[in-house]
Amino acid sequence: DVVKLFFADDTYNKFAGVSESNNITDNRANDVNKGQKSISKTNEAIKRKVFKECGKPEVIFEDDNILLINKPSGMLSQKAEQNDYSLVEYVSDYLLDTGYLSEKDLQTFHPGICNRLDRNTSGIVAAGKTIMGLQNMSNAFKERTLHKYYICIVQGKLDKRATIKGYLIKDNKSNKVSIYNKEEKNGEALPIETEYIPVCYTDKLTLLKVNLITGRSHQIRAHLASCGHAIIGDTKYGSRRINEIFKKKYNISNQML
């Protein structure tokens, strides 16, 4: 019973209307139950829709404290709006479904993710199953004892390893960033630094391994695009013409990051 999860027995009895004069209270308890069931059905529908559109996340490693999950492109790492279904909700559902956590456990601990990826970026996200796992993994990312690398395919030929610098300003209304070579707008711009390593290349395309020295919103996508090497399939910062060519020829509809 959903209500019992949140109240002690004596409080629940009062709430549910165990006393003789319980008609009003009992009706309210029934309304709460109906409301909780309605919310649950809504969440399930949203989850099914996300899985249908993006694919289901895949747990690729698990021990007693952490999960490593392959997040599909199109899925949020964390919810942006109340009704979103993100990777955070998936982690809770996964641990409930596998019996690692119970609904009672979730009253005192909410599993979370230790790193985030943009919605349209696929890749590995670490999650904590326990407080210790969450703290240790988060600290490893923060202190850079654990390194993150991104793989992407960009337009044009890059044959030398390089580190590029610049400044980034985000427009929250359009959810888009602009890159500058020098600081702009009275100090509003944030410094960015991106390292890339060519893995292989042709005259028209390059497979890059990217290391974010700073971690700003949309940094890889916007920084590479500002240098004339936009990520293939990136509808926000890439070339519409080139994206259309790859979509028609190779059926690529997601960004190659």
Model-derived regions: residue spans:
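RNA pseudouridine synthases
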Residues: 1-257
